[in-house]
Amino acid sequence: MKSFITRPYVYAVTFSVALTLLLVWSLLAVFVIPRELEQPEDEFGTIDFSQFTEQITDAATDEPIYILTLPSEDGDTPEEPSDTGTETDTEAVTEPPAVYPIITENSYLDEHISIVIETLRRYGSDFHVAEIKLDSPQFLKTALAKDTYGLNIKEKTSAQARRVGAILAVNGDYYGANEKGYVIRGGVIYRQSLRPTDDKRRKYFEDLAILWDGSLVPFDEKTTSISDLRSMGAMQVFGFGPTLIKDGEIVVDEGTEVGIANPSGNPRTAIAQLGKNHYLLVVADGRTDQSKGPTLLELATVLRELGAVTAYNLDGGGSATMYFNGKLVNNPCTNWNEIHEREVSDIVYIGY
């Protein structure tokens, strides 16, 4: 009788332990253990940009590289210089300096790239705004952690930026935390599986493509195939979201949030376009006494005030990081209370 009772008990304990170990292994495999993945070997492996060769020169900007003044805290934007000045005045504004690059604590200028960074105070949060003007979209780039594509392969934004020689960088979409969803970097198609629409951890939003001509184009994976993206000439594709601004209009509301994130505000990272080869990279601090972090609607509102016609939300929270000229610009907040830089899968950067 004793043996009869003990045997089922042992079986139950053994089964429970095995099930627990299997569950732990599954969680580690998905969220912790780094796994390098191979690029798909099919006709979609790399986008062929030769079809755009004759148009590439049209993507360049003929205008001199200079930066518009960002709005002050009260939202007013100083007037742009008029065309009524003397010839000497005009030359003083547009003629390039003799020695490049010119670097200050919050700016960078050379023959092809101009960057100015300002910190704006809005909605109880600090917005670190980098305004970028390029003479070619080729200087808007991405990089992968440890120069490797895979799951849970991570490296700090600053470490990735230093490795690739970035002038300015922010974290990307943290593609490596997910097993599905489009991933295109530098014209290479690393992943072409569709993101699930029923993910309980994160809501389904549009992706963002950066095309060969530097245009930011939001799109839906369900209605846009990899073949479509190849025809469009997609250089980069990010899968986080949501789209904040489309065609100059804010497309989020007070109830829009990323999965289970705090609806009252979070650290944020966003990319926006103001015009041809004219961009914003924005990181907003959050989860601190100094800066609560904006809602998605507040983030979109600030970007619209700055003139964005297209804007997209990248990975935020503890990942939200901005790097410029060898230093961190913002205060990354990990685990809700630690000012500490998190390791991430990828970055968006300006550089050569």
Where are these regions (language model features)?
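Active-site-adjacent helix-turn-beta-strand microarchitecture at beta-sheet edges
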Residues: 79, 98, 104, 108, ...
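Zymogen propeptides
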Residues: 2-201, 207
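Short, solvent-exposed aromatic-acidic interface loops
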Residues: 144-150, 223-226, 284-288
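Conserved, well-ordered active-site substructure
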Residues: 180-198, 202, 255-309, 319-352
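Conserved hydrophobic/aromatic beta-strand scaffold that supports enzyme active sites
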Residues: 127-131, 207, 243, 270, ...
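Structural recognition of the beta-strand scaffold that forms the well-ordered cores
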Residues: 131, 167-171, 209, 217, ...
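Short, glycine-/Ser/Thr-/acidic-enriched flexible segments
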Residues: 122, 135-137, 175, 223, ...
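Beta-strand-turn-beta hairpins that frame and shape the catalytic cleft
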Residues: 125, 137, 214-215, 273-280
